[in-house]
Curated annotation (Swiss-Prot):
Lineage of the species this protein comes from: Bacteria, Bacillati, Bacillota, Bacilli, Bacillales
Protein name: 3D-(3,5/4)-trihydroxycyclohexane-1,2-dione hydrolase
Residue segments, region Thiamine pyrophosphate binding: 442-522
UniProt keyword annotation of Cytoplasm present: no
Catalytically driven reaction(s): 3D-3,5/4-trihydroxycyclohexane-1,2-dione + H2O = 5-deoxy-D-glucuronate + H(+)
Pathway per the UniProt entry: Polyol metabolism; myo-inositol degradation into acetyl-CoA; acetyl-CoA from myo-inositol: step 3/7
Length: 644
């Protein structure tokens, strides 16, 4: 047997260079590159291996471990899970910073390979710098926290363990049914230890992502169910995008006259203008999709996880005859809502159903309902685009909260811009193939409802975990995946302040991204939630501490985000009017460096809910009568929802 004497880290790098995926006959490198933040826990081990021979891996320098791991996840998401980035950090706080990203990737079923440094396997120098000592179990380190949020976790305590660990890592990373974060913990001493690795460990490995076919039995059951139903609705989930099944879904909708709503992950699989595309569905959905869904007698989920935002906490579907048909590559997700399961690739399942349903000349019973619902939404959308603030008698979209306070915000922020009008203009002015990236706050709701996707795969929303601070890093990842397209991070001031470090990495890599920062001086989405459930405004506006009351009810904070970003070398713009916004967007397209447009918008001018409910933990007992009323409303809505 031929062997090669290498360190564990050197063997890992060599192995990663030999991984390929094949999908529909097309073969490509699986691991594009690796994000690094070096510290004592990885620099002389994995860092040395990368310096000596990185092979074809592109080595990137991150600024924050969570930021770079978010960028790696976004890269894989934009690549439809067919190519990934790895991430390496030092031990302790560096690795802990990636835990949130691991959870984000696993929640979204997006592959990302995390390689955190770890404490010494020999324990000779214990406690090493940045080590936690657990007196009840000395084998525990910070990296054990990854177990809860990883789809596969391993620790390499001996060099020879690397082989089985990495084989299993690749199994999970290339498994469309159960992929997510894979964490391989690398004790810093073991990284540098040498071993005689067999040459066959480094052979070229092609991981074929196969399309699972539906069984004849499940297909027959699905046909029997569909043919009994008159008004079915489909839900286009992220699985439609990852399976590249958009054309088949369109064919299915057109052939059988069945409309579909979009989840956040599924949006832009098919352009918004398609006659059967109702748009966003659920809590952050629009009136068209939710109205049709409420009356549907069959819900066909295609590649969706049926989160509470998609099902409106299982209260959206009100037809007493409603049943569920779930097409999913994952048995776990297909099993939800007592559905009839078709465990299969979305494309293959749709093609098989088309053939079977054409045999019986199936057609839904919709007449004008689909067109009427879309027309009603277009009318509402036009209204949202044209909302303008007036100092007197202005009623915001989220009314009854700040009606008397809005003029204070007008003065403090120097703006009269409404959020819906800003989104409308942005949607009009961006290139058709531009990619928008979002994750948290009020913007995901506005974008799922309002954004018209004009080209496929241009809507990139991380809403499986809704990770605050994902947006800027996500934009960098999307840009690395599609460097020829303009990429825009759609981010609120709250999420931006949590994390935007990879904006600097975009400058370093000359990968231009555009940050559209909506500043309403607060956590506006959560302010809506608390006040909508009977509370006052508490800890969600960005106000100075009042020296008299000792509470955060002083003057509104105004932050010059443009000035801050300009210090990095970003091209920046201040916007307080639609005219300035248009000028900034046009000029930003001409730039070759990353840009940031600081857009001051008024609170409460985002969209509100349409025909949906969200189950949150309202206080059962309170001295506040408004909270008591909110609890009673929750109980009433819960009675109309499925129990599971």
């Amino acid at each position: 047997m031929q062997t090669v004497r290498m360190t564990t880290a050197q063997a890992l790098v060599k192995f990663l260079n030999q991984q390929y995926v094949e999908f529909d006959g097309k073969q490509q490198k699986f691991v594009k590159g690796i994000f690094t933040i070096f510290g004592h826990g990885n620099v002389v081990g994995l860092g040395q291996a990368l310096e000596e021979d990185a092979g074809e891996l592109e080595v990137y320098q991150g600024r924050n471990e969570q930021g770079m791991a978010n960028a790696a996840m976004a890269f894989a998401k934009q690549k439809h899970r067919k190519q990934i980035m790895a991430c390496t950090s030092s031990v302790g706080p560096g690795s802990a910073n990636m835990i949130t990203s691991a959870a984000t990737a696993s929640a979204n079923n997006i592959p990302v390979l995390l390689l955190p440094g770890d404490v010494f396997a020999t324990r000779q120098p214990d406690p090493v710098l940045q080590q936690i000592e657990q007196t009840h179990d000395l084998s525990i380190s910070t990296n054990d926290a990854f177990r809860a949020v990883s789809k596969y976790w391993d620790r390499i305590n001996r060099p020879e363990q690397l082989m089985t660990a990495m084989i299993q890592a690749m199994r999970v990373l290339t498994n469309p049914a159960d992929t997510g974060a894979v964490t391989i913990c690398l004790p810093q001493d073991v990284q540098g230890e040498a071993w005689d690795f067999p040459s066959y460990f480094f052979q070229k490995r092609v991981h074929r992502i196969e399309r699972r076919l539906p069984t004849k039995a499940s297909l027959a059951d699905a046909v029997e169910m569909i043919k009994r139903k008159k008004k079915p609705v489909m839900i286009c989930g992220g699985g439609v995008r990852y399976a590249e099944a958009a054309e088949e879904l369109k064919q299915f909708a057109e052939t059988f006259h069945i409309p579909f709503g979009e989840t956040q992950a599924g949006k832009s699989a098919i352009e918004s203008s398609h006659p059967y595309n109702l748009g966003g569905i659920g809590v952050t959905g629009n009136v068209a999709a939710n109205t049709i869904a409420k009356e549907a007698d069959l819900v066909i989920g295609i590649g969706t996880r049926f989160t509470d935002f998609t099902t409106a906490s299982k209260q959206l579907f009100q037809n007493e005859e409603v049943e569920f048909l779930n097409i999913n590559i994952s048995e776990f997700h297909a099993n939800k809502l007592d559905a009839l399961k078709v465990i299969a690739d979305a494309k293959e399942a749709l093609l098989a159903l088309i053939d079977e349903l054409q045999e019986i000349d199936y057609q839904s019973s919709y007449t004008v309902e689909i067109a009427d619902a879309k027309d009603a939404w277009e009318t509402e959308l036009s209204r949202l685009h044209n909302i303008r603030f007036t100092c007197q008698d202005f009623t915001p979209e989220v009314e009854g909260h700040f009606n008397e306070n809005l003029n204070e915000y007008v003065d403090a922020l120097g703006t009269q811009l409404t959020q819906t009008a800003v989104i409308g203009q942005i949607n009009t002015l961006l290139d058709k193939d531009a990619i928008i990236v979002g994750a948290a706050g009020s913007l995901p709701g506005d974008l799922q409802r309002m954004w018209a996707s004009r080209k496929p795969n241009t809507y990139h929303m991380e809403y499986g975990y809704s990770c605050m601070g994902y947006e800027v890093a996500g934009a960098l990842g999307a840009k690395l995946a599609e460097p020829s397209k303009e990429v825009y991070a759609m981010v609120g001031d709250g999420s931006y302040q949590m994390l935007h470090s990879e904006l600097v990495t975009s400058l370093q890599e000359n990968k231009k991204i555009n940050v559209l920062l909506f500043d309403n001086s607060g956590f506006g989405c959560i302010n809506n939630l608390q006040m909508g459930n009977g509370m006052g405004s508490f800890g969600t506006e960005f106000r100075y501490r009042n020296q008299e009351t000792r509470k955060l009810d002083g003057a509104i904070m105004k932050i010059d985000f443009a000035a801050s970003a300009a210090g990095y070398g970003v091209k920046t713009y201040h916007v307080t009017s639609l005219e300035q916004l248009q000028e900034a967007l046009i000029d930003a397209k001409k730039q070759t460096v990353s840009t940031l447009i600081d857009i001051k918008v008024l609170p409460k001018t985002m969209t509100n809910g349409y025909e949906s409910w969200w189950h949150v933990g309202v206080a059962e007992v309170s001295k506040n009568q408004s909270v008591q009323a909110a609890y009673e409303s929750k109980v009433s809505n819960l009675q109309q929802a499925r129990s599971y």
